[in-house]
Structures are given as C-alpha cells and as structure tokens.
C-alpha cells in the first residue's frame, strides 16, 4: 500500500529542480541560474532559481517551495471542511520558461504534493501538477510531438489517464474573456489520491521527469530559426495572454497572493517584456492568423 512519505517526495522535488536547471543551462549554452534561498516566517521556505538574458532563454524561473503551518488558511478549507483543524505541509516545483526566439514556445510545468495531519486521524494527502505549451507560431509537428510525449508517460498508469488530464488541461488553461485557450495544452491533474500513495507518487515523478523530454527537442529544433521585428512584436503581444491568465484565473497565483506567499517567487512566471495593442487582429492568410484559427482551441492533436 505505502504510507505517505513527505520526505521522499521532498527529496525528489529538490533533485528535479536541479535536473531541470542543469538541462536548461545545457540548452541555453550561455547563461546560468542564479539561486535565491528564502525562509517563510510561518514555517518552511524554498529555493528560487532564475536564468535571465541567455542565448536561448530570455527568462526561465524554476521554483522549489516547502511550506507548512499549524492550521489551514480559511481559503483552503472552504471547499474542504475535513481539513479544518489540521496542520499541513505543501511542497512543489513550478517553472515558467520564456524563450527569446518567437519560434520557440513558452512553457509551464508544475508538480506538487500536499498533506494535512491531525492527531488520531489518517492524513489527508494528494498530488497535483502537469505541463503545458504556449506556441507563438504554429508548428503542428511540435504540438503532436509534445502530446505524444505526454501520452507516452501516462500509458503505464492506464489508457484513461492521458485523455482525462489532457481535457482537464484544455479546460483549465482557457481565457473566457478572450474565448481562447492559453496555448495547446498538455496535462493537468489535481487531487490525485485515488491510487495508493506509491502509484500516485510514481505518476507525479513521471510528469516531472517527462517535462524536459517533451520540451527540449522543440527548443533544439527552433532555436536557430531567423526572425525579425514582426515576429518579436507578435510574441510580446501574445505574452499578454500569459499575464492575463496568471493574474486573473490561475489558482496557484491567487492562492499565493491571498495567503501572504512570497511575491517574487509567485510572480516569477511573468514575462520580462510584454505589450498590449488595442483591438489587434492578425492579417488573413498569415502564420499569426493560423495560430488563432487552428491552434487556440481544444482538439485531439493525436488523431490520425
């Protein structure tokens, strides 16, 4: 069966952060990550690692956090009354990568574990996470490869896992006020505890370890593509959607800001440069128009 082992999860997460940072440094070939360790007065802390102004990545942030408290914040117990009066531990790795070249997609990934304890009662625990891709220029082969990687890592856990978490990702990363998805999706899962602990932990590890396997080939393929001012302007405009989603809809961002989380780490996902343009509409027949017409809506990318 396997009892929840928070220390084992923490060790994996810290190693995952190190592995992903090393992999991104190899891909960039120029810049390295700066490390910022921090403590939380209420308990716990984290390690924020940020790469800026690299050859490939304009900014990449990879954050590890492990926070704890004697009681759950009211915002967390509102829809989970069984957590009231329990101490808690929450830990995770989250990352957002903003490349320089507009032909490389922006990406986000996150894996996390939560456990709440109470004397004389079984612990309440769950895993969450996923990864998603936000291209600026449409390459269907990249998107298919991304989703194939996601499907492959899900396969050992059951045929229903990929379609379930792929659909959840499409629904979660959606901007209602724009009527479009933030990108082309991937995987999103939360409240994962319906398998025994060891299997749930194995799945979280598969998602965490599978992220670079899915992303690195796309970076390698696109990083030397020539681009000009037009592509850069469109990239900066589309980055605005990232800001809109994270500040208006993202549960993790809102929870962190509402519960006194570390602002610098929470807002590490923001792109370093972004632009808005009133009533922008892409010119018909352009790659920019194709992104809007074909890519920013949920679909089965692996259909024959």
Swiss-Prot record:
<comment type="similarity">
    <text>Belongs to the aerobic coproporphyrinogen-III oxidase family.</text>
</comment>
<feature type="binding site">
    <location>
        <position position="177"/>
    </location>
    <ligand>
        <name>a divalent metal cation</name>
    </ligand>
</feature>
<feature type="binding site">
    <location>
        <begin position="110"/>
        <end position="112"/>
    </location>
    <ligand>
        <name>substrate</name>
    </ligand>
</feature>
<comment type="subunit">
    <text>Homodimer.</text>
</comment>
<dbReference type="GO" id="GO:0005737">
    <property type="term" value="C:cytoplasm"/>
</dbReference>
<feature type="binding site">
    <location>
        <position position="108"/>
    </location>
    <ligand>
        <name>a divalent metal cation</name>
    </ligand>
</feature>
<comment type="function">
    <text>Involved in the heme biosynthesis. Catalyzes the aerobic oxidative decarboxylation of propionate groups of rings A and B of coproporphyrinogen-III to yield the vinyl groups in protoporphyrinogen-IX.</text>
</comment>
<keyword id="KW-0350">Heme biosynthesis</keyword>
<feature type="binding site">
    <location>
        <position position="98"/>
    </location>
    <ligand>
        <name>a divalent metal cation</name>
    </ligand>
</feature>
<dbReference type="GO" id="GO:0046872">
    <property type="term" value="F:metal ion binding"/>
</dbReference>
<feature type="region of interest" description="Important for dimerization">
    <location>
        <begin position="242"/>
        <end position="277"/>
    </location>
</feature>
<keyword id="KW-0560">Oxidoreductase</keyword>
<dbReference type="Pfam" id="PF01218">
    <property type="entry name" value="Coprogen_oxidas"/>
</dbReference>
<dbReference type="InterPro" id="IPR036406">
    <property type="entry name" value="Coprogen_oxidase_aer_sf"/>
</dbReference>
<comment type="pathway">
    <text>Porphyrin-containing compound metabolism; protoporphyrin-IX biosynthesis; protoporphyrinogen-IX from coproporphyrinogen-III (O2 route): step 1/1.</text>
</comment>
<keyword id="KW-0627">Porphyrin biosynthesis</keyword>
<feature type="binding site">
    <location>
        <position position="147"/>
    </location>
    <ligand>
        <name>a divalent metal cation</name>
    </ligand>
</feature>
<dbReference type="GO" id="GO:0006782">
    <property type="term" value="P:protoporphyrinogen IX biosynthetic process"/>
</dbReference>
<feature type="site" description="Important for dimerization">
    <location>
        <position position="177"/>
    </location>
</feature>
<feature type="active site" description="Proton donor">
    <location>
        <position position="108"/>
    </location>
</feature>
<feature type="binding site">
    <location>
        <begin position="260"/>
        <end position="262"/>
    </location>
    <ligand>
        <name>substrate</name>
    </ligand>
</feature>
<keyword id="KW-0479">Metal-binding</keyword>
<dbReference type="GO" id="GO:0004109">
    <property type="term" value="F:coproporphyrinogen oxidase activity"/>
</dbReference>
<feature type="binding site">
    <location>
        <position position="94"/>
    </location>
    <ligand>
        <name>substrate</name>
    </ligand>
</feature>
<dbReference type="InterPro" id="IPR001260">
    <property type="entry name" value="Coprogen_oxidase_aer"/>
</dbReference>
<dbReference type="InterPro" id="IPR018375">
    <property type="entry name" value="Coprogen_oxidase_CS"/>
</dbReference>
<keyword id="KW-0963">Cytoplasm</keyword>
<protein>
    <recommendedName>
        <fullName>Oxygen-dependent coproporphyrinogen-III oxidase</fullName>
        <ecNumber>1.3.3.3</ecNumber>
    </recommendedName>
</protein>
<dbReference type="GO" id="GO:0042803">
    <property type="term" value="F:protein homodimerization activity"/>
</dbReference>
């Amino acid at each position: 069966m396997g009892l929840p082992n928070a220390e084992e999860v923490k060790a994996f997460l810290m190693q995952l952060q190190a592995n992903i940072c090393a992999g991104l440094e190899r891909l960039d070939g120029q810049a390295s990550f700066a490390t910022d360790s921090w403590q939380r007065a209420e308990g716990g802390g984290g390690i924020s690692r940020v790469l800026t102004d690299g050859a490939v990545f304009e900014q990449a942030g990879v954050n590890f956090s492990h926070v704890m408290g004697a009681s759950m914040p009211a915002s967390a117990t509102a829809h989970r009354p069984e957590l009231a009066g329990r101490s808690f531990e929450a830990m995770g790795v989250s990352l957002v990568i903003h490349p320089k070249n507009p032909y490389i997609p922006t990406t986000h990934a996150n894996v996390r574990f939560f456990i709440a304890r109470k004397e004389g009662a079984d612990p309440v625990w769950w895993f969450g996470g996923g990864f998603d891709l936000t291209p600026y220029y449409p390459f269907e082969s990249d998107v298919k490869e991304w989703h194939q990687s996601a499907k492959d890592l899900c396969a050992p856990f059951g045929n229903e896992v990929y379609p379930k978490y792929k659909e959840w990702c499409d629904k979660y990363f959606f901007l209602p006020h724009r009527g479009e998805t933030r990108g082309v999706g991937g995987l999103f899962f939360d409240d994962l505890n319906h398998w025994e602990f060891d299997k749930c932990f194995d799945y979280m590890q598969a998602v965490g370890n599978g992220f670079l396997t899915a992303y690195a080939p796309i970076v390698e393929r696109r990083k030397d593509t020539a681009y000009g001012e037009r592509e850069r302007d469109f990239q900066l405009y589309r980055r605005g959607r990232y800001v809109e989603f994270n500040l208006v809809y993202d549960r993790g961002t809102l929870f962190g800001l509402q519960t006194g989380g570390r602002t610098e780490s929470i807002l590490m996902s923001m792109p370093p440069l972004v632009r808005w343009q009133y009533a922008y509409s892409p010119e018909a027949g352009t790659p920019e128009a194709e992104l809007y017409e074909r890519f920013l809506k949920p679909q089965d990318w692996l259909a024959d």
